[in-house]
Structures are given as C-alpha cells and as structure tokens.
Amino acid sequence: MSKIGINGFGRIGRLVLRAAIDKGASVVAVNDPFIDVNYMVYLFKFDSTHGRFKGTVAAEGGFLVVNGQKITVFSERDPANINWASAGAEYVVESTGVFTTIEKASTHLKGGAKKVVISAPSADAPMFVCGVNLDAYKPDMKVVSNASCTTNCLAPLAKVINDNFEIVEGLMTTVHATTATQKTVDGPSGKLWRDGRGAAQNIIPAATGAAKAVGKVIPALNGKLTGMAFRVPTPNVSVVDLTVRLGKGASYDEIKAKVQEAANGPLKGILGYTDEEVVSTDFLSDTHSSVFDAKAGISLNDKFVKLISWYDNEFGYSNRVIDLIKYMQSKD
C-alpha cells in the first residue's frame, strides 16, 4: 500500500491517523506548523471524545513514533515547502480546512506528493463519497475531495431511496455536534453572526451545503435536495433528518427493508441499520458513514416520509478518507 502524509493534525488529522492504523494503512509523515512533536504525542494519546489511544505513542529524535512506526514531522506553513518525497508520502490528506481548492491543494504536489485528498467539501475538486460514486474516479485526477461528513451520511441513504423509490424532492436537516470553528462564548464571527454565539449554550441554526453536494455525487438528484443545520451542544455524533417526496409509493416497512438490504449488501460498512432504541452517544467511534434509525423515521403517506440516520461526524468520516485513498491506490 502506498504511503500517506497528513497536513494538519487537528480533529480530522489525528483521527485519520487512528483510522489508518485500524485499517493497516501506512502514514509516514505529518505536517503542522502550530504544534511540536511532543504536543502531537499528547494530543494523539489523549482524546476527550474517543478516549485514550490504545497503542503506544512517543517522540523520538524529532519523529512521532506510533506503535513502533516512525512518522516524519514537518512544521511548514506553506504546503509547497513540505518535502513529502523525503518521507516517501505519495497520498496527502489535506486536513487543515484551509487549502480546499484544486489550486491551493495542488501545492502539495510540488513537494513530491502524487495525489491530494481534501478532507472537506471543495468548490472545484471532484467530490467522492464511498459507496456512491467512486466509479467516477479517474487516475489522472490529482486533487480530489472526500466531501463533508454530512454528505457522507446523507448520500448513501439518498442513493438507496432514489434507486428504489425515486426522490422527487427533499429537504435535509442535520442536527450537528459542535466543531472546532465554533466559539466557547459569544464572539465575532464575520458575516455569519449566529455562528459566533456560545456553542455550549445554544441551538444554532446554520448553513450547510451538504444536501446540495449530494447532487454532485448523484447527478440524478441535482437540484432536488437542499438543507440546513442546527448546531447543538454535544461534542460529537450528529444526525440527519431527510424528508422526501417519493415518485413511487412505498410503505415505511418497504423502505426499511430496502435500506436493510443495502446495509447488509453493497453498502456494508458504509451504511448501517439499527432498530434499537438508540441515542447519539451510542454512535461514538462508529466507523459507518451513516446508520439508518428504523425506529425514528415516520411516514405521512406512501409518498411522503421522514428518514433518520446517525453518524459519528469525526471518526466515521476519517475512516472514509482512508477508504477513498485505498480505492484510489487500487486504480492508480
């Protein structure tokens, strides 16, 4: 398997490393200009949300050493200056949240990276969602996006529903856990005034492009879905509410059966299914992109339904970053 570099050792960067270890992928380099290697050890070892790292982690001679494997550490602010080639990194995960366009992410190629995977939606890079549109990947693509955690939750469910019952139109709401861009107390937040309100005190209506992005990965749904978010005071795990009008009438039991069929078949490991009495913390560190909650959904009639699906917005997504890289490697 080709070797991976990670740019930005924040929530996603660190969890991509955990996911890589779980999946037997090789991370050989990490770049972060804001934390030194000793701080990396601390942040990787202790995690308030997912718990302590179960393996060994140490700093030795400037390297980050995880489970005995040496990882080269860079501290460059400009991606063009990161010497990925010296560490043997071919696939770079761009997880700073800053370099999200083809132009900006392409600077990694100057340092020897062969491919770049942006761990965020991108304005112009081709977007991929595992289980949905990987067949559209072409080896000549140098920079790709793994879309957003919410698009990764919504798209597999929307695919199953559209393939079987045809989505005429729909609205999505994500009830979304707090993320690092939010404020601990009220503060200025540019043009998005509500986003600057205290995260622990409020339910905050917010914009999200996740539903519209589904139209990019499932062209048949382009223009048929849009959505919004509520940011809520929980540290992790979010839930999508997809309310759709169907072209082909179906009972809620028929819908459940098709989702379960996909979860046990072509979308196994990506789309999950539960009929238990679950709540958000039951999905902490869940590796699925999306877990359909059979007991939470409702049907008004055979053509108008509300479907509910949970996701660990940090760890499920980080696992898909590695899955996307593995898929790319199989085709390159």
From Swiss-Prot:
The record marks 176 as: Activates thiol group during catalysis. GO terms for molecular function: glyceraldehyde-3-phosphate dehydrogenase (NAD+) (phosphorylating) activity; NAD binding; NADP binding. GO terms for cellular component: cytosol. D-glyceraldehyde 3-phosphate binds at residues 148-150, 179, 208-209, 231. The keyword Flavoprotein does not apply. It is an enzyme of class 1 (oxidoreductase). GO terms for biological process: glucose metabolic process; glycolytic process. PANTHER family: GLYCERALDEHYDE 3-PHOSPHATE DEHYDROGENASE (PTHR10836), GLYCERALDEHYDE-3-PHOSPHATE DEHYDROGENASE-RELATED (PTHR10836:SF76). Belongs to the glyceraldehyde-3-phosphate dehydrogenase family. This is Glyceraldehyde-3-phosphate dehydrogenase 2. It comes from Drosophila pseudoobscura pseudoobscura (Fruit fly). The gene is Gapdh2.
